[in-house]
Amino acid sequence: MAYYKLIREIPDGKAVHGNLYLVHTSGVREQLTHICPTLENADKMIPALIYRVAVTQSPRFKRLLPVLCQVPGRSGIRFHRGTKPQHSSGCILVSAEDEIKLTNLWLNEQHGKEEIRLEFC
């Protein structure tokens, strides 16, 4: 079974850097495949839990983007392009290329009827 894991570093000022991985499990062993680096606003970090991800049309950005489902006390938490913590009011930032890659990756999984799970660490 595969799922995704976002491993974050200790906040550095206003920024929290992280890395998104695809996790393959085989027995008790996990194999991590790096997908892309991430950036969050330290003041608005997503709680360390497991979330479902869906790809939907963003009313704000007017394009398909991945969105985290059931984030406690919040809504509309998306993965979108950005390079500085101030580019986010609580979303997860990735490069423009990685935004396209993630959207396509998760859209394909969604069409395949697979549940997309993402663990925040």
Model feature map: region roles:
Residues M1-I92, E99-N104, Q110-C121:
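Cell wall/extracellular polymer interaction/catalysis modules
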